[in-house]
Amino acid sequence: MEHLHRKQITNTFTETFPGDLSMNNTTRQTPGVLYCSVLPTPVHHPQLLAWSADVAEMLGLESPVPEDVLILGGNTVNPTMKPYASCYAGHQFGNWAGQLGDGRAISLGFCSGKDSMEYELQLKGAGPTPYSRNSDGRAVLRSSLREYLMSEAMHYLGVPTTRALSLVSTGDAVLRDMFYNGHAAYEPGAVVLRVAPSFIRFGNFEILAERNNRDLSQQLCDWVITRYYPEIRGEDRVVQLFQAVAERTADMVVQWLRVGFVHGVMNTDNMSILGVTIDYGPYSFVDEYDARFTPNTTDLPGRRYAFGNQAAVAYWNLGRLANALAFLVPETDKLVAVLKNYQDVYETKYYTMMANKLGFDALREDDRLLIDSFEEMLRTVKPDMTMFYQLLIDLPADPGTAADVKQFFQSCFYTEADEALLHTCIAAYSKRIKTNTCSKEVSAEKMRAANPRFVLRNYILHEAIEKLEKGDDALLKKLEEYIKQPYSKNADEYFIKRPDWAAQKAGCSMLSCSS
């Protein structure tokens, strides 16, 4: 175990690929390079607000001392760090956006963890880079706390995700227009240090394809395969890579749907080549079950990134990745074949997951129709998703009359439920459960493992932000503990529906990309 300021950091990425070493932060196009060397911009008063002991243990890091906090806030780097900002492009809301890059993220290099894996350390909110597009490269406490807590919460939920080591306040005010409506205001600034094996995105390949840089794209593919997909061997390595990324992406989206997570901004520059959840912005968990729910105000006109559309968007994004890799593949029909097979791969994973949520002993051929009808009922009745599945675990063997069933689930309804539809669906479900070859206890255990009892709803995060901005970190500390056991009853003070006051409140139901 070592302190961060003494930790040996390796610079595998910058030593492997061409970069712009000028240290010039002027916004510009950077053709022919994968990164620009940059330094974080110091802040006035970095103060540690939160520290993930679990992530620190994974990285082999001691509890932070003042020298470490200076690094976490972006005021200095240790002698082995060679910070950089990555160059990538992306499709945003379905449209090509050109060069984007790390506009407020600065990677410090790679840290060897206790598991002998290397983890990329990245500061978010540590100042401008050549990719900041004339912005300040900063982040506010509001968005930084959300990223810190949700990164860790998703890990404990069992969802593939980046992690977060620390949350540091900067002592500086940051000007932000939260809803892009002309009402800008100063907010307290903060920096998050986030952690992942790599932050390579679909967009890293898109920028190289757009610039027709075949050699560099092939080099990046080879690097990703060697480090993160060592099982890939033989011919068609790029096709194999695409297939592996597609499968991991399907896994990730299925896990999002399992816990009711809505990413909110699934642009291709926010899609990880490792299939982990990346870039926590205007995200949300669903409260009432609504496939059309999007937490992102920018997404409201078309609801492109709505809860129920995430699998389709992932497919579309994979199509953009296939296009970016096509000039490396002599027989592009092989990429097309992988993409065509994605829907079958996704559906198999999805229905298997749903069988676990519902406590089935196994996924049988006719279960898919039952699952589809079950979800149709949820879309109509719109119960609180988290609470509904928890109540379902304790459903009596004989659910009783339509009135009995409605009363059983009454605590999770936001509006008057369709009693007949609910009863018909629950009766069919109960009939199927009785055919399980496993015991009721085993079935219930499967359901408890698949259905979280506590999720970080936006109104809870909003309360934590408001308190922290006033100097009260008690709720933050409580939530840091609650998120570690989301399948237990430890956080049952929050086993309630979203309060009425939060239904239309900014920061609870309405969010934006402003951070």
Curated annotation (Swiss-Prot):
It holds the Pfam family SelO. Its cofactor is Mg(2+); Mn(2+). Its EC number is 2.7.7.-, 2.7.7.108. The active site is at D269. Mg(2+) binds at N270, D279. Nucleotidyltransferase involved in the post-translational modification of proteins. It can catalyze the addition of adenosine monophosphate (AMP) or uridine monophosphate (UMP) to a protein, resulting in modifications known as AMPylation and UMPylation. GO terms for molecular function: AMPylase activity; ATP binding; magnesium ion binding. This is Protein nucleotidyltransferase YdiU. It catalyses: L-seryl-[protein] + ATP = 3-O-(5'-adenylyl)-L-seryl-[protein] + diphosphate; L-threonyl-[protein] + ATP = 3-O-(5'-adenylyl)-L-threonyl-[protein] + diphosphate; L-tyrosyl-[protein] + ATP = O-(5'-adenylyl)-L-tyrosyl-[protein] + diphosphate; L-histidyl-[protein] + UTP = N(tele)-(5'-uridylyl)-L-histidyl-[protein] + diphosphate. Keywords: ATP-binding, Magnesium, Manganese, Metal-binding, Nucleotide-binding, Nucleotidyltransferase, Transferase. It is an enzyme of class 2 (transferase). Belongs to the SELO family. InterPro entries: SelO. ATP binds at G101, G103, R104, K124, D136, G137, R194, R201, D279.
